[in-house]
Amino acid sequence: KINLEGPIVKDKTSFNISARRSYADLIAKPFMPDDEKYSYYFYDINAKINHKFSDRSRLYLSAYNGKDHFAADYDSNTDYKDGSKMNWGNTIISARWNYIFNNRLFSNTTVSYNNYLFDINAYTSNQYALGNDETFTNRYSSDYRSGINDWNYQIDFDYNPSPVHHVKFGTGYIYHRFRPEVMTSKISDRTDDQTYRDTTYHNMNNSRIYAHEVSAYAEDNLKISSRLRLNLGLHFSLFHVQKQSYFSLQPRISARYQLTDDITLKASYTKMSQYVHLLSSMPIAMPTDLWVPVTKEIKPMQSHQYSLGGYYTGIKGWEFSVEGYYKDMRNVLEYKDGVSFFGSSTGWENKVEMGKGRSVGIELMAQKTLGKTTGWLSYTLSKSDRKFAKGGINNGERFP
């Protein structure tokens, strides 16, 4: 790991650059058999520049690039070889301008670009001796890619009109470019001096999906009395894709009431809409998970979440809490039974179903905040399930 930081212009401009790379692949390489090679590594690079125009105006520039790589190759002899490799990573570039209008109002204006891509490649190669010292080679390879590009503009305001109000509001715009899935296969037959076949097949639609997302929000953290606080908010969003527009109003409300000096109660309700779905092809998180947008056929996911909690601070140096929640979801997206993103020329929209979901849970926590030893201990019990139309996934029965 490397970290460099320092001033560019004294009391005005500074920089910070850090980079790291794992080295397990370099350590393991000498111990691998000659006919099998495995490699895994990751790296990330962060760079920041901060500039102070004045006491009221500051600019923050940042860039990030990270990548994970996995490869496996098998070479039993000179006649047969096969292997695969997987790469996934993110690139983020952003500029944030912070401006203080007065002691009650300040703003943050952010412009950013984000690129996510994963790529899986597999190949097999066979060689045959034809005589006269000539070799015939047959090679097959397949490549699967998925990615997202986002261009984002956001402006946020923080306003304190009085001691009992803390208001936040803002608006934003995102231009999305999705490539949900692109699969390419290539077959070649050749000798040392002649090519008999060199063909590329595009098994899936290579088209991109473009979308525009506009949002605006406002919230007020309101002090009703010395014991009661309310947070009231409303979020508006509009998503336009494939000549189809979706919009949503999403209220949020939370209340915090201090029952006694030691006991505080909290309750909240949140409605949310999500225009980008995560399609998981495996029961654990993998880079093969696809981020796909809503379309004319795929509707936005909507959820309503309710929570209730209590907090106790009656023992010096300790905090105890219990919190429960319930979340109801609509238009949840899952792959149909027996379907994944591999091995089919069918587009992703034809391989998924929309259904319902729910999630419920409770969390207990004890936290020590004073003394030479501090820390926390928590326990969470939760359950989540899905339900699809009869005859669909799991024959319409609920499943985790």
Question: Which residues does each predicted region cover?
Answer:
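Transmembrane beta-barrel wall of Gram-negative outer-membrane proteins
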Residues: 1-23, 34-69, 85-109, 113, ...
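Repeated loop/turn-to-beta-strand initiation elements of outer-membrane beta-barrel proteins
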Residues: 12-15, 56-59, 101-107, 117, ...
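Gram-negative outer-membrane beta-barrel transporters
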Residues: 326-328, 346-400
